[in-house]
Swiss-Prot record:
InterPro entries: TPR-like_helical_dom_sf
Organism: Treponema pallidum (strain Nichols)
Keywords associated with the record: Signal
Span of the signal peptide: 1-26
Name by which UniProt lists this protein: Uncharacterized protein TP_0447
Length: 374
């Protein structure tokens, strides 16, 4: 058993010792009030960034165990309160239950409800005690902790175990504090599938991201907007008209479009590669355009050459473009245009990259590819 698994087991045993039985360390109420699962998870993230994976596992496991115990404690408090309300003939409504608890001075139950009502008003549960209790039980899941645990195991090459944690996080995604974090989970599952050489699974996860993008239809391959985009590209000998007309500001989906493009190019599936490449290129240019609008108050899109020059003059934007594969995305776009017989448009894309791309290596590649088309 390697060091990571030993640390993982130690984390489980530590969590069980600290939180496993009522009153072992201190009273139940004191214990659940005295520590915060989110604080523990933040520490787990800190030590993870230091690559102290054993401590990461211990903190994340403790956070997950404490989250579960806190919810179980809250459920017990509310179940006891509901039982007393039923015996007093009070209807099963949150408003009636809360009024009874207030009148009786049952502070523990009131504190539980007050904490819930800070973020979820009674109408969210249709004023039903039963629905609130079901929601509370579901909230025992801690998908953020599962995601971090998966990252640790992935980093240590324990891919099967990492994937299980990612799937746990995905199954409980409804409990995410930041809903968009579901995309982090999907991308994590896709990456582990790649590492496990499970390309069909990887494609499935990436298409899951695209399923939330109205411009892409996995069933039809080409949606109406995509058809219009391709018509625009074909209608001119340059790609300028396309980039002036269309903006798609879905940066969260950029990685999925990029990776699917690479997958389909690798298998020479041009019909599948082109639509995802078109949208990847459009998202990339739209993102650069948005960043420039925020930094340069008088900026308006003129053409690709101007966009690339301005991008190169802003280190933060250039860094983002480099880190998010923008230049490779645009090269793939040009490559696929050429393979589809749109030679003039491909040359125009190569030329703009060769002349004005602020990343020298990609400018050099574009110049070489352009020379092959002449």
């Amino acid at each position: 058993m390697n060091n990571l698994i030993k640390a993982y087991a130690a984390g489980v045993m530590s969590a069980a010792f600290l939180f496993g039985s009522e009153g072992r360390v201190r009273s139940e109420s004191d214990r659940v009030r005295g520590e915060d699962p989110w604080h523990l998870l933040q520490w787990a993230q800190v030590v993870y960034e230091r690559e102290e994976f054993g401590d990461t596992l211990r903190y994340a496991q403790r956070a997950r165990a404490l989250r579960r115990e806190q919810v179980e404690h809250q459920c017990r408090v509310l179940l006891r309160a509901r039982t007393r309300a039923e015996s007093a003939g009070i209807p099963e409504t949150l408003s009636d239950l809360y009024a009874l608890l207030k009148s009786r001075g049952e502070t523990d139950a009131c504190e539980v409800l007050d904490a819930i009502f800070l973020t979820h008003a009674p109408h969210v549960f249709q004023n039903s005690v039963s629905k609130l209790l079901q929601w509370l039980k579901d909230s025992a899941a801690f998908p953020e902790a599962e995601l971090l645990l998966g990252k640790v195991f992935e980093g240590e090459g324990e891919y099967a175990q990492a994937l299980q944690h990612y799937r746990n996080a995905w199954d409980t995604r409804a409990q995410l504090v930041v809903p968009d974090a579901r995309f982090d989970i999907i991308y994590a599952m896709a990456n582990v599938s790649r590492l496990l050489s499970q390309q069909d699974e990887r494609e499935k996860y990436l298409l899951l991201v695209l399923s939330e993008d109205p411009l892409y239809s996995a069933r039809e391959v080409w949606g109406k907007t995509l058809h219009a985009m391709l018509r625009t590209i074909r209608s001119s000998n340059t790609v300028e008209k396309f980039f002036k007309l269309y903006r798609h500001r879905n940066v969260l989906a950029l990685r999925a479009y990029q990776e699917l493009t690479e997958m389909y190019v690798r298998t020479d599936n041009i019909e599948r590669a082109l639509p995802v490449s078109v949208l990847a290129a459009d998202i990339a240019i739209s993102a650069l355009d948005s960043f420039l609008q925020k930094i340069e108050l008088t900026y308006q899109y003129k053409d690709l050459a101007d966009l690339f020059l301005r991008t190169g003059s802003h280190p933060t934007i250039l860094k983002w473009a480099n880190e998010h594969g923008v230049w490779q995305t645009l090269l793939h776009f040009a490559d696929l245009l050429y393979k589809k017989g749109l030679h003039a448009q491909a040359r125009d894309m190569y030329y703009n990259l060769a002349e004005k791309c602020p990343a020298f290596e990609y400018a050099r590649r574009a110049a070489y590819k352009l020379s092959l088309t002449l």
